[in-house]
Amino acid sequence: MIEGLREDLRNRRIGSGMSRLDEHWVRCGRLDPHDEDAAGLLCYVSQWVDAGWRDIDVIQDGLCAFPKGRRVGLSILDYAYVLMAEGVVWVAEENIARALANFDLVLSLKTEIVEREILALAHFWSSRCNRKAGEYDRALEHVSEACRLASEADAGPMAATMRVAESWLLFQKSRTKDALKMLSEADAVLRETDDFLTRGNIESSYGRMYRREGRYDLGLRHFSAAIDEYGKRDPEHRNLARTLTNMGYVERLIALQLRKRIDSDVSQHRRSEPELRRDYENMRAQALAHLDRASEIYRLHANHRGAGTVCVNRGHLHLDSGDLYKADDEAREAYALGEQKNDYILMARARLLECMVENTKLEEEIDDAAWVAHLALEAAKEAVDLARRTENRRLLARALIWLGLTTCTTSPGSLDAAREISEQAAALLKNEVQDHIWEDLQVLKARVVKGGNVDATLQAWSQGVVGDRTFQQLTEDFADLIIPKIWEHESRKVARVSKRLSISPKKVRRVLARLGLHGA
């Protein structure tokens, strides 16, 4: 039995492994604690539960046969088996610290464990824990080692499933070309299997990568393909809920693009096409429907990260439509869910949404201005603090951007601080595509430049007061000051600015784009 499960897992023969388990359950009804292979079977069954067979309560029930006192008498390999199974349960319960402790203990026994697959799985699960905690460097180290061990064990399909996770971590580090290549290679291997969950993960990864590049229609197509793959195994799998959440996120971004077109028509006294407004409303409705369905699935699995992410995305949709109090409620619920699991990423996202809500209240002069300003600034500061506890660069950049925007709004005399915050965010987004987060950065830069005291800046430079800025940074600062002014004087003609300053039009456009002015 155990050897068959191991081989099916190594080769990702999912239907075969599940049939094998179903037959065993018909005969026995549960794991036999007196079986000499009970610990090993429990370990491998935990991997099959992760692959889509039954629920985690099967493993929780099996662990009752291995209380702490009994584990002392186990062999080292059986002890490792039990630790692995228990770690999988901790992950399912979102207790990342305890799960990592289990997997670390297994890896500390590596000289005594001959099964390379077990060591590969321990590294793989450690990577999943690190990734969930936003510890991407450590996650990448673990998953790379997992892939190496699986390959050495001649478990190519198993290694391919691990490559999917590795590709996403590479993408997080802006190594998009490497990530896509690795994902394509894994896809080629797993297309020959019935591992529908991992095939769905591949499609979902493509969708998220294309979403990041602003190719929203292509992203939605891959998300739809992912849902089809997941549905072949389990129409209520938590990964399907994650993809529905991603779809809702992208549909909101598309709706925002449509609204910008509508607002542009209004500002230019043009009448928008009825189809445009209908498309906008339909896209918002689709986003909310997908988020509601995701919420139902996450509720079945009691998944805090997923449920909280739905709250954040739904809150942004409420914010977009001007329903500030619903948006605020969603932000607070998301924060509470994250706080229960010490989920810094979710907590930071929740505080970011709260900050945006309070900033909107300030703009619309809702509630006491001083108190709202205080709430906005505190939410922004906490979002930055929480994001710094992770290695999520985009999350930190976004938190910094909104701290900068809030500082500009609530403390007009603190533009130097806002400028420094803007530079920190820009450094984090240096190799990123020009998406909605980048657009927020341009708004911040424009506010800093517009609100700054140019005479005071030039006077400070003339006295040699430049802080810790390099000559290159000072050159860029000067370009940011002078080029927009001349652009205005020259009727916003890039060619005239280029000719007057004897610089390339490309340089002019780059500076204006950096400040969010080009094309305005």
What are these regions (language model features)?
Residues 11, 93, 126, 133, ...:
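Structural motif corresponding to the intra-repeat A-B loop/turn of tetratricopeptide repeats
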Residues 33-36, 77, 117, 157, ...:
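Residue signature of alpha-solenoid helical repeat architecture, marking inter-repeat boundaries
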Residues 37-41, 81, 121, 161, ...:
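Residue register of alpha-helical TPR repeats
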Residues 25-29, 63-71, 104-111, 144-155, ...:
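Amphipathic alpha-helical segments of tetratricopeptide repeats
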Residues 14-15, 56, 96, 136, ...:
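TPR-repeat structural position
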Residues 463-520:
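Bacterial C-terminal helix-turn-helix
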